[in-house]
Amino acid sequence: MYDYEELLNRAMAKMPDTETTDARFVIPEPKLFSEGKTTILDNFGNIADTLNRDPDHLMKYLTRELGTAGKIEGTRAVFQGRFTRAQISDNIQAYVDEYVMCSECGRPDTQLVRVDRVLVLKCSACGAHRPVKKRKVSNVVVRDAIEEGGTYELRIDAVGSKGDGIAKIDKYTVFVPGAAKGDVVKVKIKKISGNLAFSEKV
């Protein structure tokens, strides 16, 4: 008969011998700006590295969920169309929930492997594994492009007759006082009237 301590030691010895970190898992905040009719995710490479996932796999997921085309340019991602930080963040979080986080222990210490042509999420922290199912687009919360009181990073596309900088986000035309064409500015939306939005630099 083994005593409790010896049984515990034997059980611990059979646990996966992997290095994990107790540090809080933090997804980098997407750094976005608009360039013409495209949206640039400037720190895409950093996000993929943090998630420990193949950039091509992450990019394929994002373009599918956003319903657009895109490409990777160095360490940044370029999406056709205008998207907000909220839209990108929601989809990255959905990707993490499905393709990164272990459903048993809640840790990000996982790998994607194929077993008999089935994509499986294998956890190196607790040893659990589960098949990955394609997430439906309806599971991702899509928010309004901009909201009053929200802050956004924009690229100024033009200057209006009154000297205000003008940027486009989705269907909205955003006016930014004191901004010049080509500037990348962070603004707070003060008021929205129809498809027009009035902001101030922050």
From Swiss-Prot:
Q: What InterPro entries does the record tag this protein with?
A: IF2/IF5, NA-bd_OB-fold, TIF2_bsu_arc, TRAM_dom, Transl_init_fac_IF2/IF5_dom, Transl_init_fac_IF2/IF5_N, Transl_init_fac_IF2/IF5_Zn-bd
Transmembrane parts of this sequence: none
Residues covered by the TRAM domain: 145-202
Q: Which HAMAP family match?
A: eIF_2_beta
> From which organism does this entry originate?
Methanosarcina acetivorans (strain ATCC 35395 / DSM 2834 / JCM 12185 / C2A)
Pfam family example for this protein? Answer: TRAM
Q: How does it assemble?
A: Heterotrimer composed of an alpha, a beta and a gamma chain.
State the protein's purpose.
eIF-2 functions in the early steps of protein synthesis by forming a ternary complex with GTP and initiator tRNA.
Q: Name the domain of life this protein comes from.
A: Archaea
* Family named by the database record: Belongs to the eIF-2-beta/eIF-5 family.
Keywords on record: Initiation factor, Protein biosynthesis
Name the chain's protein: Translation initiation factor 2 subunit beta
Q: Which GO molecular function terms does the record list?
A: translation initiation factor activity
Record keyword Signal present: no
> By its UniProt entry, which NCBIfam families does this protein fall under?
aIF-2beta (TIGR00311), PRK03988.1 (NF003067), PRK12336.1 (NF008993)
Q: What Gene3D superfamilies does the database record attribute to this sequence? A: 3.30.30.170, Nucleic acid-binding proteins (2.40.50.140)
